[in-house]
């Protein structure tokens, strides 16, 4: 009974999460009116689960590797993850807060591990390499766009360490995890510095040439920072 209740609760939560289906807005833009902070982590987890299943299906496909069943299938995978990542990281880079920053620190290593699980997947790499070899040998003819996509994925696997031995791959995973965390920390420090920066202008003549609306806005900003009679500009 308790398992059924949990399952129903999870289904209800999933149903209300705007990231788990296409945005029903003009041009498919993010539905910010419905998006809440608590939607992000479940969407990331669901997105990882979805893409893992899609990768598993590619790897276990009994048919010979082809452009369609390997490269196209790989490129089409991770729809939920792409949707939530696009919104989440756009906000954390421009309009973040302590709650989002804490969540980003939690999500980044998770995504690093997920990426490694894809691009260090030997069976998946073999299929991608097989399609690449088919084109190199002239056994398949691809359009310019198809060639670009194949070449992009093949190089990404190689550059991500798919050809390394198991020991070196494990070390690479550790480095990638550390980098993901350090990158987030560095970005947060830069953002904090930008948010703290104030350019204070004491003389109105120094603002000559600026539109009146900009000058008025700077005066309001100065008042908000307790600097009446001056003009403040932020980054």
Identify the role of each PLM range.
Residues 8-235:
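Zn2+-dependent metallopeptidase catalytic domains
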């Amino acid at each position: 009974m308790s398992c059924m209740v949990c399952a129903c609760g999870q289904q209800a939560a999933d149903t209300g999460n705007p990231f788990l289906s296409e945005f029903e807005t003009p041009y498919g833009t993010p539905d910010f009116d419905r998006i809440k902070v608590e939607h992000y982590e479940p969407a990331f987890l669901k997105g990882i689960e979805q893409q893992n299943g899609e990768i598993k299906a590619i790897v276990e496909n009994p048919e010979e590797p082809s452009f369609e069943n390997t490269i196209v299938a790989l490129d089409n995978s991770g729809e939920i993850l792409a949707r939530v990542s696009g919104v989440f990281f756009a906000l954390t880079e421009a309009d973040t807060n302590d709650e989002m920053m804490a969540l980003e620190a939690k999500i980044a290593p998770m995504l690093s591990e997920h990426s490694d699980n894809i691009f260090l997947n030997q069976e998946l790499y073999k299929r991608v390499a097989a399609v690449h070899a088919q084109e190199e040998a002239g056994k398949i003819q691809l359009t310019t766009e198809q060639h670009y996509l194949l070449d992009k994925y093949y190089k990404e696997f190689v550059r991500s360490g798919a050809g390394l031995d198991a020991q070196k791959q494990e070390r690479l995973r550790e480095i990638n995890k550390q980098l993901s965390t350090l990158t987030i920390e560095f970005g947060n420090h830069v953002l904090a510095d930008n948010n703290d920066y104030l350019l204070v202008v004491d003389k109105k003549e120094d603002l000559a040439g600026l539109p009146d609306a900009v000058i008025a806005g700077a005066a309001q900003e100065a008042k908000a920072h307790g600097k009446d009679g001056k003009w403040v500009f932020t980054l």
